Each structure stands twice: as structure tokens, then as C-alpha cells.
Amino acid sequence: MKNLRKFPLVNLFNNYMIDAPEPSNINYFWNFGSLLATVLGIQILSGIFLAMFYTPHFDLAFLSVEHIMREVNYGWLIRYMHATGASFFFAFLYLHIARGLFYGSYRRPRTLTWTIGTAIFFLTILTAFLGYTLPNSQTSYWGATVITNLVSSIPFIGHDLVEFLWGGFNVNNATLNRFFSLHYLLPFIISALAIMHMIALHTNGSSNPLGITGNLDRIPMSPHYLIKDLVTIFLFFIIFSIIIFYFPTILSDADNAVPADPMKTPMSIVPEWYLLPFYAILRSIPNKLFGVIAMFFAIFILFFLPLLDFNYIRGNKFQPIGKLLFWCFISNFILLMFIGAKHVEIPYVAIGTYATLFYFAYFVFFIPLSSLISNTLLDLNQKSNSITK
């Protein structure tokens, strides 16, 4: 084994996957990184095989998808793997972000790791939207029309930008070609960012549930955490297989099986479940331009999170106020997901507006307030102890 470590690639693999020192107390919430890497590999491989048979043409895109499902050997399996894999990727991504929020993984010295991760999150949302439009079904066509039309809210140049995106005066053949090219390219950029994310992580090491620097109590990644990762990966494949073989369309819309009809608007235009919270934020603001700004800021605000949290204690494990606010935020995020799937009518509009206000208030107001209260109490306690002594 020592001789093999002389090879640069083997040595690199050994440093990152075998001998990497990890805190001895991390739990299963730290397994989502390996799960995300697994699902990303599935998405790239299944996407490459789908691209071999998909035709990015307005009149042929839907037919090519049907050809994959009906005539390509195991084409149905590849497509369902790709569609279901997208849902799993976002589920793991949201859980990964939630773990980072709860345990303060965005704090120094891991700010760069968090920043790269947020960039991955944004590109993943963009990639998912582009893939959503490619089947050219009734929902994907009108979804592409509505979302790309949001660019027209930009003053002076909005309408020109929309026509530039479309390559014409509506969603057409040029649009599908552009979206297909970008959808094929972006996963490789995400993979490169994921490697950068891992390099930045290993520079300072993983965080831990206690929120303290655990350099004095670390153990090698193999076999301890390597086996632990494999356990959750095997569990994922079991659940993944059950959904693919028994409930492959459980998360899809019925209009996805209908070809695009530019002359007929569907009853409701609803994106995939993992985009619903941001869709709800978009719809909660009547003004088109401000709605678009709010939707993008809901993602980009994660970049500023390290600046908004100035608490002496990293994470919420030992902070009752921070813990309560965190679970309120999670409940609010699930509520936004629910509201995004509903029609624009009373009482969903009002609920969506209040949920959107709380979403931004959590980052801009409640996190700094929680930090201020916690720091004040710690300072008062320290002063009282010094006086007592």
C-alpha cells in the first residue's frame, strides 16, 4: 500500500477518502455529502444516455421522449432514474443545507465551503428548470413560457432579453436547443464546483455537532465513516429502486404526458415540488419586478449568512432561541412549498405573503437578534462570574 501511495492520484484519493481526519462525534446528518455525490453520478450517467436518444426540436422533443419510453431498451428505466434522481438530489440538498444552518457550518473557517455550496445550489436550480422544459409537454412548455417571461420585468431591455432567450417571439425550436445545451453542460460545472467544495472542506476539516474545533479528537475516515456512508447509500438505493419500479410517476404532473399546445393554456402551471418554495415567493409579491428580485434574493441571501450571524457560539445545539427560530424557519419553508402548489386565490395569497416575510425576516432580523441576545447573556454571565470570584 505504501508503494501505491507514491502515485499522485492514489495519494490524493488516500488523503481525501481514507486517511482524512474527521471529528469523532459527527452523526448521520454528515452523510448527505456522499449521498449527493452518488445521486450526481446517477444524474450525469443517466443524462448522457438520455441525450443519445433525445431530439431538441420543438416538433420532435415530445416524440423522442415517447420513443425513449416505448422503444429504447430500458429507456423507461433510464428516464425514471433521471426524473426520480432529481427529486432525491434536491431532497438531500435541502437536508444538507438545513444541517449547515442548524450547526453553523457557514461560520469561519468554513465560509468558502459554504459560498461554493450556495453557488452549487443556485446552479442546481437553474439546471433543474432547464431540464423541466425539455420534454416539451404541456406543463413544460407553459412553464418555460411563464418563467422566461419574468425577464421582461427588467426595465428598458426586458423584452429584448426575453426574445434573445427564446431565439424568437415565443418558446420554439431555438429555445429547446439552447436549453438542452445548457442542461447538458451545467452538471459538469456543478461537478467541478463539488470538487472545489470538497477541497475547501478538507482544508479546515469538517465541523461537528458541538460547534467546537475538534482537531484534538479526530479519527481516520476509513473504515469508520466510509462504512457509515455506505450504509446510507445502500438505504438510498433500496428506496430509490422501490420508487422507480413501483411509483415512478408519483411526483409528476398528468399534463407531462400531453404534448405542448401553444393555443391552450393549462388550468394550472406548477413547477416540480423542489422549486415550489421559490415559486411561492415569486407569486407572493404583486409587482412583477419585485417578485423576481425576491425570488433570486431568497437564494442569494445564503451568500451573506456568514455576515449576519455573529454569535459567539457556533450552531444552535446549545441555543434555545436559535433552535426555536430554526424549526420555525423549516416549518415556514414547508408551508411555502405547500402554497406554491396552490392556485392564486384567498387565503393562499395572504398566507404566502406572510410566509415570504418570515423567510427573509429569519435571515435579516431573527438571526442577528438571536446572536445579539445570546452574546449579551454570555457577557453578563462572564461579568457576574468575574465579580463573584
Curated annotation (Swiss-Prot):
Localization terms from the record: Mitochondrion inner membrane
Pfam families reported for this sequence: Cytochrom_B_C (PF00032), Cytochrome_B (PF00033)
Name the record gives this protein: Cytochrome b
Gene: cob
Job description of the protein: Component of the ubiquinol-cytochrome c reductase complex (complex III or cytochrome b-c1 complex) that is part of the mitochondrial respiratory chain. The b-c1 complex mediates electron transfer from ubiquinol to cytochrome c. Contributes to the generation of a proton gradient across the mitochondrial membrane that is then used for ATP synthesis.
Source species: Schizosaccharomyces japonicus
PANTHER family cross-referenced by the UniProt entry: CYTOCHROME B
InterPro entries registered for this protein in UniProt: Cyt_b/b6_C (IPR005798), Cyt_b/b6_C_sf (IPR036150), Cyt_b/b6_N (IPR005797), Cytb/b6-like_sf (IPR027387), Cytochrome_b (IPR030689), Cytochrome_b_C_euk/bac (IPR048260), Cytochrome_b_N_euk/bac (IPR048259), Di-haem_cyt_TM (IPR016174)
Primary location recorded for the protein, binned into one broad class: mitochondrion
Assembly with partners or alone: Fungal cytochrome b-c1 complex contains 10 subunits; 3 respiratory subunits, 2 core proteins and 5 low-molecular weight proteins. Cytochrome b-c1 complex is a homodimer.
The record's free-text note on cofactor binding: Binds 2 heme b groups non-covalently.
